[in-house]
């Protein structure tokens, strides 16, 4: 193993991730500086989770790992896997989503099928009713998913849509018990507080890419708008889930730049998406990432974030193909199951069988 990797491995393995907080009689965690390791930490205040998060490698070290020759790729994965097994060694975290409002988005994100700027033929529908949202929640709960992401297109929800969704959330929580995650666009502090009160425990809002590459991907809103949304969610006591998409033309250094920003924001969970080029979008002819480059990039994120959840989500089928199980060898500790927003995911039974074979899920 390369000396750089061996030194990083020793240093990261020497750090200790505190055990999950014990529940109180009310079912919430006692205030503490400890960090929670498991995926089902919806009721733990963010400040109680992350104040003693083990330190990952520096940006300079991450760049050095990215520049190692291809012959060291397996050693990079092995290093990340060792870190994952110590700091995030529990069962694989699983989440699923529903496309609760689709299409006609005014944003011009170059990768997105739902943008009104692109001719993709993507489905268009208004906000789903409570019964449909409840049915999907129950399906995901029965499949083993711990978290249910409700995703809507558009810059942000209207006041009426937000109220409708919060009413549905109360019922979903009462009847299924599944943890709720909102992915509803830009968020104000008042909207974040409303979601928290309705029973949402986390909020997902991707930065998509690094600040330096963002202008090549989107021109209709500012990078700081997305950062403000993540901060508003965290300030409201919501668990924050934010990541990006690999393979849009960014460099290794820009993926690492995004990782550093996510660390500064102290997010709880990092979803990694791999570009699946969609016809009609500006990135339709973009080749998919080489599988090993994608896996090495995931591994570098694990080295930078030893104890945060890292979930591989959209695009894993197109980019990784038969190597999908390698995401866990690369340091990921979870994945999205079921279908995505506008594309079909792998059969859930196949994913669950894969997880059982790997021993990361019963």
UniProtKB/Swiss-Prot annotation:
Enzyme class, UniProt record, top EC level: transferase
Coiled-coil stretches: none
Binding-site residues, [4Fe-4S] cluster: 105, 109, 112
Enzyme Commission numbers on file: 2.8.1.6
CDD domains, sorted: Radical_SAM
Record carries keyword Transferase: yes
GO molecular function terms attached to this record: 2 iron, 2 sulfur cluster binding; 4 iron, 4 sulfur cluster binding; biotin synthase activity; iron ion binding
Keywords: 2Fe-2S, 4Fe-4S, Biotin biosynthesis, Iron, Iron-sulfur, Metal-binding, S-adenosyl-L-methionine, Transferase
Cofactor: [4Fe-4S] cluster; [2Fe-2S] cluster
Reactions accelerated catalytically: (4R,5S)-dethiobiotin + (sulfur carrier)-SH + 2 reduced [2Fe-2S]-[ferredoxin] + 2 S-adenosyl-L-methionine = (sulfur carrier)-H + biotin + 2 5'-deoxyadenosine + 2 L-methionine + 2 oxidized [2Fe-2S]-[ferredoxin]
Binding site for [2Fe-2S] cluster: 181, 241
UniProt pathway: Cofactor biosynthesis; biotin biosynthesis; biotin from 7,8-diaminononanoate: step 2/2
Domain Radical SAM core: from-to ranges: 87-316
Pfam entry (one): Radical_SAM
Biological process per Gene Ontology, one example term: biotin biosynthetic process
The keyword Membrane belongs to this UniProt entry's keyword annotation: no
Protein role: Catalyzes the conversion of dethiobiotin (DTB) to biotin by the insertion of a sulfur atom into dethiobiotin via a radical-based mechanism.
Subunit structure, interactors included: Homodimer.
Listed name of the protein: Biotin synthase
Native source species: Nitratidesulfovibrio vulgaris (strain ATCC 29579 / DSM 644 / CCUG 34227 / NCIMB 8303 / VKM B-1760 / Hildenborough)
Taxonomy of the source species: Bacteria, Pseudomonadati, Thermodesulfobacteriota, Desulfovibrionia, Desulfovibrionales
């Amino acid at each position: 193993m390369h000396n750089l990797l061996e030194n990083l491995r020793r240093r990261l393995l020497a750090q200790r991730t505190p055990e999950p907080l014990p529940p109180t009689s009310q079912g919430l965690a006692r205030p503490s500086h400890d960090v929670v390791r498991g995926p089902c930490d919806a009721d733990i205040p963010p400040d109680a989770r992350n104040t003693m998060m083990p330190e990952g490698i520096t940006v300079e070290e991450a760049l050095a790992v990215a520049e190692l020759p291809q012959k060291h790729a397996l050693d990079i994965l092995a290093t990340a896997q060792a870190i994952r097994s110590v700091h995030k060694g529990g069962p694989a975290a699983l989440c699923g989503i529903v496309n609760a409002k689709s299409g006609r988005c005014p944003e011009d994100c170059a990768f997105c099928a739902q943008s009104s700027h692109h001719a993709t033929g993507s489905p268009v529908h208004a906000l789903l009713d409570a019964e449909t949202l409840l049915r999907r929640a129950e399906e995901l709960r029965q499949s083993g998913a711990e978290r249910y992401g409700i995703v809507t297109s558009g810059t942000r929800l209207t006041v009426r849509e937000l109220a409708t969704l919060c009413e549905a959330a109360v019922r979903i929580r009462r009847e299924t018990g599944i943890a709720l995650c909102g992915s509803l666009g830009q968020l104000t502090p008042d909207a974040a507080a409303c979601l928290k009160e309705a029973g949402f425990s986390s909020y997902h809002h991707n930065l998509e890419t690094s600040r330096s590459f963002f202008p090549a991907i989107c021109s209709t809103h500012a990078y700081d708008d997305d950062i403000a949304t993540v901060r508003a969610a965290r300030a409201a006591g919501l668990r924050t889930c934010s990541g990006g998409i690999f393979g849009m033309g960014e460099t290794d250094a820009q993926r690492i730049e995004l990782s550093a920003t996510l660390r500064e924001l102290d997010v709880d969970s990092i979803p990694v998406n791999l570009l699946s080029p969609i016809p009609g979008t500006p990135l339709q002819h973009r080749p998919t990432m080489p599988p090993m480059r994608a896996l090495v990039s995931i591994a570098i994120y694990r080295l930078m974030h030893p104890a945060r959840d890292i979930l591989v989500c959209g695009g894993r089928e197109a980019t990784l193909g038969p190597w999908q199980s390698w995401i866990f060898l690369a340091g990921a500790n979870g994945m999205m199951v079921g279908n995505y927003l506008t594309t079909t995911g792998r059969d859930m039974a196949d994913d669950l069988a894969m997880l059982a074979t790997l021993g990361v899920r019963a």
